[in-house]
Regions:
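Extracytoplasmic "Venus flytrap"
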Residues: 4, 8-29, 50-54
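Beta-alpha junction/loop-to-helix N-cap segments that form part of ligand/metal-binding clefts
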Residues: 24, 39-106
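Short beta-strand elements in bilobed, periplasmic/extracellular small-molecule ligand-binding domains
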Residues: 38-54, 110-112, 160-177
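Periplasmic-binding protein-like
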Residues: 69-79, 99-101, 140-141, 191-207, ...
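Extracellular glycoside hydrolase catalytic/binding regions
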Residues: 96-126
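An alpha-beta-alpha
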Residues: 116-171
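Extracellular/periplasmic periplasmic-binding protein-like sensory domains
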Residues: 211-282
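Segments of small-molecule ligand-sensing domains
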Residues: 275-350, 356-357
Length: 358
């Protein structure tokens, strides 16, 4: 007999990054359907859903509403780091857990967040370590004007400098802004070897379109390779042919050319992971996340999350978009997350790096 538990879903169906949220939402709902149909598990999930509509000011109130007005203690959602940081105080207030299934910039370890996707040592560092010897050392950074863009550029600047490279430009625009003339003009003048694109949603699609136009000009048929740690298959349709040639890093790419990418797949896996952590353990859904992970490990399940920092071990895959599909260039075996980059320049340490404390 299955016991049914409420889980929250906090993902936007509209707004400037709707394609990302749409893929994640479908992944959550697929995971719920699979768990509910799995007779080897004694848990089933009932979805309590709220739509923030891509508006930052709605995330915290809607998170509070889910935790206050339902039995849900585990919420799947948030796309931007800004929205994740908005809900953490509500998770702390009500003892909830956010299952965060998208890449982020690191430098965080909350006992109320399950970081299921990749952090910089699992995406940005491997991507730059491939790009600098392969493409050249003249870099240009462009990003959305919030913590994701800022931190990705900061980490990348350190890595490029360590490789004796040059950062030719580091520019930011507001999330959703598509006024890119000044950035395209600067890229035209500087001719970087590669561009780290940390723009989100509509801003990214507009940038790729403008850059594709620049590449048609004389003298720009080579170089200007775009690198990304957050562009997946779920955005190919929105970006169109302008994204061709983009090189992305992440833990998973569609093997058969699907459209969900890692945003869909990691969201789906996250639902399964929670179900396995709760299987055979009535009442465990109210445990603190670190205790839930540690106790599940003691009962024979090998959790995806590291109990010391609540980040998942993930492979690092580098792939290039060609003819609308990502083709793998390089793959690293699953890497333990190092959210504070204590090993980023080669220091070796096999023991726990970080303990989550309240």
């Amino acid at each position: 007999m299955k016991r049914t538990l409420d889980i929250g879903v906090l993902l936007s169906r509209s707004g400037m990054y709707a394609a990302l949220a749409y893929a994640s939402r479908l992944g959550v709902l697929q995971g719920v359907a699979e768990v509910n149909a799995d007779h080897t598990l004694d848990v089933a999930f009932r979805v309590v859903e709220r739509d923030p509509e891509g508006r930052l000011d709605r995330y915290a109130p809607l998170c509070r509403e889910i935790l206050r007005d339902s039995q849900a203690r585990h919420i799947f959602g948030c796309i931007t780091s800004a929205s994740r940081k908005e809900v953490i105080p509500e998770l702390e207030r009500f003892g909830g857990v956010l299952w965060y299934p998208v890449p982020y910039e690191g430098f965080e370890a909350s006992e109320h967040v399950a970081y299921m996707h990749a952090c910089p040592n699992q995406h940005l560092i491997p991507l730059l370590d491939w790009a600098l010897p392969s493409l050249g050392k003249r870099a240009y950074f462009v990003g959305s004007n919030y913590i994701w863009g800022w931190e990705m550029a900061r980490i990348a600047r350190e890595r490029v400098a360590a490789a004796a490279g040059d950062v030719l430009g580091d520019r930011y625009i507001a999330v959703g802004d598509t006024d890119l003339d000044h950035i395209i003009q600067e890229i035209r003048a500087l001719k970087p070897d590669f561009i780290l694109n940390s723009l989100v949603g509509d801003s990214s699609y507009a940038f790729l379109a403008r850059l594709a136009e620049l590449k048609q000009e004389a003298g720009f048929q080579s170089g200007l390779t775009v690198l990304s740690c957050n562009f997946t298959e779920c955005e190919v349709e929105s970006a169109g042919s302008a994204a061709e040639g983009l090189v992305s890093a992440g833990p998973w790419f569609e093997p058969e050319g699907g459209s969900g990418g890692s945003f869909h797949e990691i969201a789906r896996q996250s639902v399964h992971e929670l179900a396995k952590l709760l299987h055979g353990r009535p009442g465990a859904d109210v445990l603190p996340l670190s205790e839930l992970v540690q106790s599940a490990a003691g009962s024979g399940h090998t959790p995806r999350l590291d109990p010391t920092n609540l980040h998942a071990r993930q492979p690092a895959i580098i792939a290039r978009l060609l003819n609308g599909r990502f083709q793998e260039i390089k793959r690293l075996p699953p890497l333990a997350a190092d959210p504070y980059l204590t090993r980023q320049f080669g220091a070796s340490h096999d023991g726990p790096l970080l303990k989550v404390v309240s």
